[in-house]
Amino acid sequence: MYTQGSAFKRQNLTRHLVPLIEVAKHGYVIAIVEYRPTPTGIFPAQIKDLKTATRYMLNHAFEYSVDPYRYACFGDSSGAYASVMACVTGNMQEFSDEDVRFSPLHYRACVDFYGPIDFSRMQEFPTNWDHESEKSPTGLLFGGVNIRTVPDLLEKSSALNYIDSKKLPPFLIMHGKKDRMVPFSQSVMLYEKLRQTDHRADFYALENCDHGSDAFFTPYSLTIVLDFLSNNLKKGN
């Protein structure tokens, strides 16, 4: 399940179609998920939409020739945030539109390319973006407010608050050390929290790479993704 980055606005669903086709050539069925954009798509709409799309694919597994027991999330930027949150919130009802008692989800792996993790700390580190005003991507995600006025949403939206001893899928994290939009420290925090709670995570720091760099979709980078997916989606895992 692939979710495209867009600062939570309307997504260009074909932006990474070429590298995704390369991944599909290795036997993967890829569904590109369009989540509700801001300003109408208010948190946690994006997470709910990803889970709804996943359930749709599982309910049509025969039609799309997919294995309903082996599926993963993959996203970049805001799409990576949705992917990570879908995995760490698991079957919490408040993050699903469907009844989780009858349609539980169990993602087997998560690929996170330079996604935000904790919105309350985005402005602490070097960035050339406004992450806090009512017109910022996060402000619009929260309904058009300054994020400092809604501490409850900041807490609820932080992926770090859902990472504990419960079972989680393995994570592959890739982030550019020169990212000027989503601070590199966001992925560092995610990786450290996963490791502190004894979860599996691989972290690749890309030197001199900015947000959304083509370096993330080179054959070398895609080989890392393919190896990760192969290791974690193979039968018997």
Regions found by a protein language model. Give the residues of each.
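Alpha/beta-hydrolase superfamily serine-hydrolase fold, recognizing
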Residues: 1-237
